[in-house]
C-alpha cells in the first residue's frame, strides 16, 4: 500500500479534474479491491453519514456536493452507485471516489449501481471516454473489474436500508441479500439485477419494469419488507427527481438524486441526505456548479434514460 502522503497527492491531483496515469489507476483499483472484498453485500454503516445518489460523471457537480456537504474525511459519505456514464468526466469522477475510499476506508462507502457494469458502460459513455483519454481500454477494464466487488447495499445503524435501485421478489430478508454471490458482472435478471434496477411505483404489488430489467414494487411491498427486517426507511437513487429527493410509498421509501441538471439539460436540482447522530434526517439541495468548457466528445451517447 502507498503512504497516505502518496494518496493525498493523488487526491489533490484528482480534485483538479486531472486523470491519473494508467499505471496509477491500475494500482488504485488493486488497492480498492483488497478493501472491497472484505465488505459485505449488506455493508453496515454508522451515523452520522451523508447519503448520495447518482453522480454520472458530473465531476464539477461532485465537487459542489463536497462543498455543500463537507469534504472527506470531515463528513462520512455513502454513495449509492452510478458514478460513470452520461457526464463528461466519468474517469475523473470514479477515480476520485475510489481514491477517497482507499484513503478513508471507514468513512466512505461506495455501492454498486446499474451503470457499474461492463455492458452498460460500453453503451453510455465510460468505455468511449477511457479510449479518448488513455488511447486504450485498459483503465475501463481495471474499473469494471473493480465494480464486481462493490457492495450491493448498506444498512445505516440497522434502520435505514440503502441501495441503488429497489427490491426483488426473490429477496424477502436482508439475510437473503447477504447470501448472494455478488462478485460478478450484473446479471440480466434475478435478485442481484433487481437490487440495481427496480423502482417504486404507485401501483401495489410487483410489476414489469419499463426499463427492461428489475421490477416495479408497490407501497405494500416496501412496507412489508421494512416490517420484516425492522427497518424505518429504504433510501435509493436510480431515478431523477425534480427537487433532488422525493418521498414516496407513505415515507417507506425515499429517492435521492445527486446529479443536478442531469445530462446537462434536465434542469433539476440535486440533493444529499444527512443522517445525524440521532438518526435525524436533513436534506441539502444544490444547483449545478458553474459550467466548464465542455470537452470534445466524438461519439454521442443514446438518449434513452437508464
From Swiss-Prot:
GO terms for cellular component: cytoplasm. Mn(2+) 2 binds at residues 82, 114, 164, 238. Keywords: Cytoplasm, Hydrolase, Manganese, Metal-binding, Protein phosphatase. Mn(2+) 1 binds at residues 54, 56, 82. It is found in: Cytoplasm. Its cofactor is Mn(2+). Its EC number is 3.1.3.16. InterPro entries: Calcineurin-like_PHP_ApaH (IPR004843), Metallo-depent_PP-like (IPR029052), PPA2-like (IPR047129), Ser/Thr-sp_prot-phosphatase (IPR006186). PROSITE patterns: SER_THR_PHOSPHATASE. The active site is at residue 115. It is an enzyme of class 3 (hydrolase). One of its GO terms (molecular function) is metal ion binding. Its main location: cytoplasm. It catalyses: O-phospho-L-seryl-[protein] + H2O = L-seryl-[protein] + phosphate; O-phospho-L-threonyl-[protein] + H2O = L-threonyl-[protein] + phosphate. CDD domains: MPP_PP2A_PP4_PP6 (cd07415). Expressed at the same level in latex as in leaves. Binds 2 manganese ions per subunit. It holds the Pfam family Metallophos. PANTHER family: SERINE/THREONINE-PROTEIN PHOSPHATASE PP2A-RELATED. Belongs to the PPP phosphatase family. PP-2A subfamily. This is Serine/threonine-protein phosphatase PP2A catalytic subunit.
Amino acid at each position: 500500500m502507498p503512504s497516505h502522503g502518496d494518496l493525498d497527492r493523488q487526491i489533490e491531483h484528482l480534485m483538479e479534474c486531472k486523470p491519473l496515469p494508467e499505471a496509477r489507476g491500475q494500482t488504485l483499483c488493486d488497492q480498492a479491491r483488497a478493501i472491497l472484498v472484505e465488505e459485505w453485500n449488506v455493508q453496515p454503516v454508522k451515523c452520522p453519514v451523508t447519503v448520495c445518489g447518482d453522480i454520472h460523471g458530473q465531476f464539477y457537480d461532485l465537487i459542489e456536493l463536497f462543498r455543500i456537504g463537507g469534504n472527506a474525511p470531515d463528513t462520512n459519505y455513502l454513495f449509492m452507485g452510478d458514478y460513470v456514464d452520461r457526464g463528461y468526466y466519468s474517469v475523473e469522477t470514479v477515480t476520485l471516489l475510489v481514491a477517497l475510499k482507499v484513503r478513508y476506508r471507514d468513512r466512505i462507502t461506495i455501492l454498486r449501481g446499474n451503470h457499474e457494469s461492463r455492458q452498460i458502460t460500453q453503451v453510455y459513455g465510460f468505455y468511449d471516454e477511457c479510449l479518448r483519454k488513455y488511447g486504450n481500454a485498459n483503465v475501463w477494464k481495471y474499473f469494471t473489474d473493480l465494480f464486481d466487488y462493490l457492495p450491493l447495499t448498506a444498512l445505516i445503524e440497522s434502520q435505514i436500508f440503502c441501495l441503488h435501485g429497489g427490491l426483488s421478489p426473490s429477496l424477502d430478508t436482508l439475510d437473503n441479500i447477504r447470501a448472494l454471490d455478488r462478485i460478478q458482472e450484473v446479471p440480466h435478471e434475478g435478485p442481484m439485477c433487481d437490487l440495481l434496477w427496480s423502482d417504486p411505483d404507485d401501483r401495489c404489488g410487483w410489476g414489469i419494469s419499463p426499463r427492461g430489467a428489475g421490477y416495479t414494487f408497490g407501497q405494500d411491498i416496501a412496507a412489508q419488507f421494512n416490517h420484516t427486517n425492522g427497518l424505518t426507511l429504504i433510501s435509493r437513487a436510480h431515478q431523477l427527481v425534480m427537487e433532488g429527493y422525493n418521498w414516496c410509498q407513505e415515507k417507506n421509501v425515499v429517492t435521492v438524486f445527486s446529479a443536478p441538471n442531469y445530462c446537462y439539460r434536465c434542469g433539476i436540482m440535486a440533493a444529499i441526505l444527512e443522517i445525524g447522530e440521532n438518526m435525524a434526517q436533513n436534506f441539502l439541495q444544490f444547483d449545478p456548479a458553474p459550467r466548464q468548457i465542455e470537452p470534445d466528445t466524438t461519439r454521442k451517447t443514446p438518449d434513452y434514460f437508464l
